[in-house]
Amino acid sequence: MSAPAIAIIDYDMGNLHSVSKALEVVGARPLISDRPAEIFAADAVVLPGVGAFDPAMARLQERELVPVIEQIIEQGMPFLGICLGLQVLFECSEEGTEPGLGIFAGKVKRFQSEPGLTIPHMGWNQLTLRPSASPLWQHLPPSPWVYFVHSYFVAPEDPSLVAATVCHGQQTVTAAIARNNLFACQFHPEKSGAVGLQLLRNFVALVKD
């Protein structure tokens, strides 16, 4: 099969080119776009994002991308959310007042202050994987190190959504979710070295299947 076309949704929230480059490295044909026709024509969709919740939702609304994302997920097209692209899938955030996409029940919460704890949670940290939770964990070490930059985390109402957790200080929070063909992670695969590339390789393999 030829390289699968993966649409990277462009809504002016963060550098999309590092995600695009990483997908290229693992054998995909990435396309950065905010045009619904191009996004729907792809084999899979990635929603990255860095920044704050309210501006992200405002940009998605302005570009009329909310119904596009909803339809893609409803149709079961392979979907990967990264960082802010995970958070906007939930109902709301303590960071702002805008409603999220509400694909899943739950909210985005801020890390609690602890003595000596740095917020944002920034740098490399180890995941605790739920092995059966996601085909994206194939060929990864048991407790892989990945790269985080965030002050907020998702708290799903349905615990079965959680595919991986991470500890920051005394707090264990959701690091990734998985449901059918939808996956989303709080960490940055494109900044997570060999582990991140393997995760993206697994996503591309899933698209090829």
UniProtKB/Swiss-Prot annotation:
SUPFAM superfamilies: Class I glutamine amidotransferase-like
Listed InterPro entries: Class_I_gatase-like, GATASE, Imidazole-glycPsynth_HisH
UniProt cross-references to Gene3D superfamilies, sorted A to Z: 3.40.50.880
Enzymatic reactions: 5-[(5-phospho-1-deoxy-D-ribulos-1-ylimino)methylamino]-1-(5-phospho-beta-D-ribosyl)imidazole-4-carboxamide + L-glutamine = D-erythro-1-(imidazol-4-yl)glycerol 3-phosphate + 5-amino-1-(5-phospho-beta-D-ribosyl)imidazole-4-carboxamide + L-glutamate + H(+); L-glutamine + H2O = L-glutamate + NH4(+)
One term of GO molecular function: imidazoleglycerol-phosphate synthase activity
PROSITE patterns hit by this protein: GATASE_TYPE_1
Domain Glutamine amidotransferase type-1: 5-209
GO biological process, one term: L-histidine biosynthetic process
CC per GO annotation: cytoplasm
Pathway: Amino-acid biosynthesis; L-histidine biosynthesis; L-histidine from 5-phospho-alpha-D-ribose 1-diphosphate: step 5/9
Keyword annotations: Amino-acid biosynthesis, Cytoplasm, Glutamine amidotransferase, Histidine biosynthesis, Hydrolase, Lyase
EC number(s) given by UniProt: 4.3.2.10, 3.5.1.2
Catalytic residues (positions): C83 (nucleophile), H188, E190
Coiled-coil ranges per UniProt: none
Subcellular location field: Cytoplasm
Domain of life: Bacteria
Main location: cytoplasm
Pfam families recorded: GATase (PF00117)
Protein role: IGPS catalyzes the conversion of PRFAR and glutamine to IGP, AICAR and glutamate. The HisH subunit catalyzes the hydrolysis of glutamine to glutamate and ammonia as part of the synthesis of IGP and AICAR. The resulting ammonia molecule is channeled to the active site of HisF.
Subunit structure: Heterodimer of HisH and HisF.
PANTHER family with a match to the protein in the record: IMIDAZOLE GLYCEROL PHOSPHATE SYNTHASE SUBUNIT HISH (PTHR42701:SF1)
Record-given protein name: Imidazole glycerol phosphate synthase subunit HisH
Organism the protein comes from: Thermosynechococcus vestitus (strain NIES-2133 / IAM M-273 / BP-1)
